[in-house]
Amino acid sequence: PSEEYRRIPWIWRVAIAAGKRNDAAELRAILDASLPQVDAPLLIRGETGTGKELVAHACHASSRRSGQPFFTLNCAALPESLAESELFGYAPGAFTGALRGGKPGLLELADGGTVFLDEVGEMSPYLQAKLLRFLNDGSFRRVGGERELKADVRIISATHRALEAMVEAGSFRQDLLFRLDVLQLQLPPLRERPEDIGPLAERFLDHACAQTGRARARLSA
């Protein structure tokens, strides 16, 4: 991707607009200026706390899939077996304690929409291989299942890690990185956006006042 896709210089304006619940048109205008409306996998990079999940939601809301489901899976929060069942679903009797009728995974539930894979760098090699197959042709099998399933799902992923270094170390598949990194956004940390500190502080103050039922306060210099 070109450099203009690799950085959103006004990413915090997206956060401010979302926090104030401005209409979707404003978010769409901000994103349209920085990201092509291409229905392709998107990789969001940035340090912890830069708003990667917020941006994933905004990208979904500005896409042609906006009226369809959006689901999130944090790859660092679940062990491999649970993450596999959550993403791909499982067939009846797949394991002890499985629901009698099986359970659809996020890919099935999100058909026509978007799945956001947060902390994708923490995904195990086994799950990386299953995800790669899905990205190749949209097909997958539930855990313990024999039937091939298909789903039309856009994958948005995010990471704070250097995936290229992980590829060199052998802990992340290079072919999967190519599939995930069709479009890329690099989110700058707030320390590189000092002009946004004031507006963000106002947003947080408004939120705190609303929660406590107090009149709107003002920040002093």
Outline where the language-model segments fall.
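Conserved post-Walker A coupling segment in P-loop NTPases
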Residues: 14-19, 23-26, 30-97, 108-124, ...
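Helical "lid/switch" subdomain of P-loop NTPase nucleotide-binding domains
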Residues: 55, 82-86, 91-94, 99-106, ...
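Short glycine/serine/threonine-enriched helix-capping/active-site loop
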Residues: 73, 158, 185
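A short beta-strand-to-loop transition that corresponds to the Sensor-1 phosphate-sensing loop
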Residues: 119, 157-162
